[in-house]
Amino acid sequence: MTATKLHKKVILVGDGAVGSSYAFALVNQGIAQELGIIEIPQLFEKAVGDALDLSHALPFTSPKKIYAAKYEDCADADLVVITAGAPQKPGETRLDLVGKNLAINKSIVTQVVESGFNGIFLVAANPVDVLTYSTWKFSGFPKERVIGSGTSLDSARFRQALAEKLNVDARSVHAYIMGEHGDSEFAVWSHANIAGVNLEEFLKDEENVQEAELVELFEGVRDAAYTIINKKGATYYGIAVALARITKAILDDENAVLPLSVFQEGQYGVNNIFIGQPAIVGAHGIVRPVNIPLNDAEQQKMKASADELQAIIDEAWKNPEFQEASKN
């Protein structure tokens, strides 16, 4: 995709709670000129209904072609967004979903590639770091053109939690969650800042904020998905808007720095997996990772998170079906 392209096309694979919320976010924000929605055959009519429903919002936003799509419609798409997968149930971790969702991912990616698609993959199905890796393996695409939503939502949750604790606008909070999008993620406290002021320095004027409260704050961020799932069954609004933000950065060639699931080539001593860290993203995918200098404790947490993901991938790739389908 070139930065000057006027007609930008997105194909969404998966019209569940996350997918339909993402489609609504795209319409609301006027992102892309064409949106196709792919669903499994037995849910095709739902995609037709959602496309029709969304089209009725267009007079309030901006023109867009919206329709229930088939895999052949991916051929000239700029971006394919994968939200399809088995949902995370109460009591399940994201990593519990590996077996079910790898098989689904393989089927999706194979059909997208067979269409002649030559754009960028954006993966949001969980466990997202593992499924971003499998999308790369099954597609044979360059690593720069396979992106996972990574810790984009986690970092937003972190910023919002800090903003509420410190009574400032979340847009003035600059802080990242890195590592797995899941239980082994960690907060990069050493580089958190409020409008350029290091968090530790900022807290000197916040006498009522104790260190124990910050530990509790991070735990709330890390466990937010479980809290929401237990209360309403699924998380979808936050991740939908995160995906819309990533989509805009790609389609508008923003070269924005966002926390994404990015291929590792030695940064932080990690290799050959996708894991959450900030990266510059634009029209051609990942421009380059942004390697925040971690302190020793954070570095250890990054390595531990990567080791956990690597163990899951190694176990999954013992399956001959996945080995045979791998192109990278």
Curated annotation (Swiss-Prot):
GO molecular function: L-lactate dehydrogenase activity
A single cellular component GO annotation: cytoplasm
List of catalytic residues: 181
Binding site for beta-D-fructose 1,6-bisphosphate: 159, 174
Keyword NAD: yes
Keyword Oxidoreductase set for record: yes
Regulation: Allosterically activated by fructose 1,6-bisphosphate (FBP).
CDD domains for this protein: HicDH_like
Positions annotated to bind substrate: 88, 94, 126-129, 154-157, 235
Amino acids binding NAD(+): 18, 39, 46, 71, 85-86, 107, 124-126, 149
Compartment(s): Cytoplasm
Modified sites of kind Phosphotyrosine: 226
Pathway it works in: Fermentation; pyruvate fermentation to lactate; (S)-lactate from pyruvate: step 1/1
E.C. number(s) listed in UniProt: 1.1.1.27
Disulfide cysteine pairs (residue numbers): none
Gene3D superfamilies membership: Lactate dehydrogenase/glycoside hydrolase, family 4, C-terminal, NAD(P)-binding Rossmann-like Domain
Stated role: Catalyzes the conversion of lactate to pyruvate.
Assembly mode: Homotetramer.
Protein name in UniProt: L-lactate dehydrogenase
Organism from which the protein derives: Streptococcus thermophilus (strain ATCC BAA-250 / LMG 18311)
Recorded name of the encoding gene: ldh
